[in-house]
């Protein structure tokens, strides 16, 4: 991807620091053993290289303030939680569920507590006696009670927390027995937080649970002729869009405008029937590659359904993705894609004309989760902004390979960056904007640095699609050009 031409990294005073020297300086604070481990996760991208040159998906250094989550967070908080018509039990002590309760803005349509349950919290509230004697009976009773209290639920998932795996409870046996009793899907998910090195394994475990406990229902429905969708040649599924602030809805609008039929959304505003119906589609459109590539690959291998990673951040990338998607179908869809791109051109030109003069040349440092350290970059470029640093909380090597298509030579790369490292990088690079998560938000705002939260859009959005780009541009302008910042001084400038 080509960044804006108006300002080069060398010309921008904010990036006068040599990033290679900066890495060395920051690592000096560590003991030798820790320094050797962390230096493998930090690098400066060299154009033409096949990847970003960092190690990833490795256990965090003990004692470092990592921003990562756990496997439970990846399964319950990301993949399963947004399935709106299922009840998701946080099986274990109350804290894990309580502190992750409704933390992501997964918008959905429905009546909460009647036929949808996305913002509700259900827990087995493990106590000491449950650790000693086991919690299988308690879990079975909980499922029975939930069925009585919320009869319109379409299924239940059991999101196991650390103690469940440590004491060896058999949640699979409970799930099988309970499913027969209530005649609905009961899905056990072995997502205990101690598994793996981050929330990324939780995504994988959640994907495997869909494969093992939901898709057999698909196969049976196909065999019995009871599947409740009449396939067409234009059927697609949106995979890995969690509808943060309505993002999936914005994406769906564009896909339907070019003539495609969206059969399923995974998993923002999604239902269990949509999961079951997905293996009937002609193409899976993957938004968050990191969290959903596993099930997409499985469907390709098992059902012959191809998949494509798309990006609807910023008009340049939207047009590119629409054309790539349309190329998988016939000339009718391809022609409609061009019509849709042309339809929104005037709107796009108006947004850029308004905000480009106010944002051009501004620098941004990113540090987010699954896909946004690369996917949001084109939207910044479309506004004339510059990326000087980016990194993933829980990225894998293939994420960093994909990132090379979005960044330019000299970009600072940081994997699983610690709180200390990130603060030191920002102090020296002095970007105009920091775009990261809620844990970082107030640290940098107290430094008088403009900040936008890239996990939940700072309670704004949607940011996907052409309409979302207008909101994105407005929000970046609000953050950078608010008069607030002229009234506050950074600690290092005193």
Swiss-Prot record:
It catalyses: N2 + 8 reduced [2Fe-2S]-[ferredoxin] + 16 ATP + 16 H2O = H2 + 8 oxidized [2Fe-2S]-[ferredoxin] + 2 NH4(+) + 16 ADP + 16 phosphate + 6 H(+). GO terms for molecular function: ATP binding; iron-sulfur cluster binding; metal ion binding; nitrogenase activity. The keyword ATP-binding applies. [8Fe-7S] cluster binds at residues 70, 96, 162. The keyword Glycosyltransferase does not apply. Its EC number is 1.18.6.1. [7Fe-Mo-9S-C-homocitryl] cluster binds at residues 288, 455. Its cofactor is [8Fe-7S] cluster; [7Fe-Mo-9S-C-homocitryl] cluster. It is an enzyme of class 1 (oxidoreductase). GO terms for cellular component: molybdenum-iron nitrogenase complex. One of its GO terms (biological process) is nitrogen fixation. InterPro entries: Nase/OxRdtase_comp1, Nase_comp1_asu, Nase_comp1_CS, Nase_Mo-Fe_asu. Binds 1 [8Fe-7S] cluster per heterodimer. Binds 1 [7Fe-Mo-9S-C-homocitryl] cluster per subunit. Keywords: ATP-binding, Iron, Iron-sulfur, Metal-binding, Molybdenum, Nitrogen fixation, Nucleotide-binding, Oxidoreductase. It comes from the Bacteria. This molybdenum-iron protein is part of the nitrogenase complex that catalyzes the key enzymatic reactions in nitrogen fixation. Belongs to the NifD/NifK/NifE/NifN family. Tetramer of two alpha and two beta chains. Forms complex with the iron protein (nitrogenase component 2). This is Nitrogenase molybdenum-iron protein alpha chain. It comes from Leptolyngbya boryana (Plectonema boryanum). The lineage of its organism: Bacteria, Bacillati, Cyanobacteriota, Cyanophyceae, Leptolyngbyales.
């Amino acid at each position: 991807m080509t960044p804006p031409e108006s300002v080069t990294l060398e010309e921008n005073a904010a990036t006068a620091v040599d990033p290679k020297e900066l890495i060395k300086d920051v690592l000096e604070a560590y003991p030798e053993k820790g320094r050797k481990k962390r230096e493998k996760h930090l690098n400066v991208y060299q154009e033409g290289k096949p990847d970003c040159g960092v190690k990833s998906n490795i256990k965090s250094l003990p004692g470092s303030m990592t921003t990562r989550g756990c496997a439970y967070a990846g399964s319950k908080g990301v993949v399963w939680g947004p399935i709106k018509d299922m009840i998701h039990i946080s099986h274990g002590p109350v804290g894990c569920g309580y502190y992750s309760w409704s933390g992501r803005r997964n918008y959905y349509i429905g009546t909460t507590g009647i036929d949808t349950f996305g913002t509700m919290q259900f827990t087995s509230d493990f106590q000491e006696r449950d650790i000693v004697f086991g919690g299988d009976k308690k879990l079975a009773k909980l499922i029975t009670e939930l069925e009585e209290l919320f009869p319109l639920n379409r299924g239940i998932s059991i999101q196991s927390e650390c103690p469940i795996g440590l004491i060896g409870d058999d949640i699979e046996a409970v799930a099988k027995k309970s499913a027969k009793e209530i005649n609905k899907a009961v899905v056990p998910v072995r997502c205990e937080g101690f598994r793996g090195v981050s929330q990324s394994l939780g995504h994988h475990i959640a994907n495997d649970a869909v494969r093992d406990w939901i898709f057999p229902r698909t196969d049976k429905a196909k065999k019995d002729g009871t599947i409740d969708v009449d396939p067409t040649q234009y059927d697609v599924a949106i995979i890995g869009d969690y509808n943060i602030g309505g993002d999936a809805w914005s994406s769906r609008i564009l896909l339907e405008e070019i003539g495609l039929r969206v059969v399923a959304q995974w998993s923002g505003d999604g239902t269990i029937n949509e999961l079951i119906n997905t293996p009937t589609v002609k193409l899976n459109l993957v938004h968050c590659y990191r969290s959903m590539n596993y099930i997409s690959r499985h469907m390709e291998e098992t059902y012959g359904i191809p998949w494509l990673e798309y990006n609807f951040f910023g008009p340049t990338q939207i047009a590119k993705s629409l054309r790539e998607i349309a190329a998988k179908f016939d000339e009718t869809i391809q022609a409609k894609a061009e019509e849709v791109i042309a339809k929104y051109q005037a709107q796009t030109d108006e947004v850029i004309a308004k905000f480009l003069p106010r944002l051009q040349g501004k620098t941004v440092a990113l540090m987010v989760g699954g896909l946004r350290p690369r996917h949001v970059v084109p939207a910044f470029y479309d506004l004339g902004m510059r990326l000087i640093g980016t990194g993933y909380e829980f990225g894998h090597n293939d994420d960093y390979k994909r990132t090379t298509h979005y960044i330019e030579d000299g970009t600072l790369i940081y994997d699983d960056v610690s709180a200390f490292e990130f603060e030191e990088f920002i102090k020296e690079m002095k970007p105009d904007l920091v775009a990261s998560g809620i844990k970082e938000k107030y640290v940098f705002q107290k430094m008088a640095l403009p900040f936008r939260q890239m996990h939940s859009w700072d309670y704004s959005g949607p940011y996907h699609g052409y309409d979302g780009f207008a909101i994105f541009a407005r929000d970046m302008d609000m953050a950078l050009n608010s008069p607030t910042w002229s009234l506050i001084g950074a600690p290092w400038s005193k």
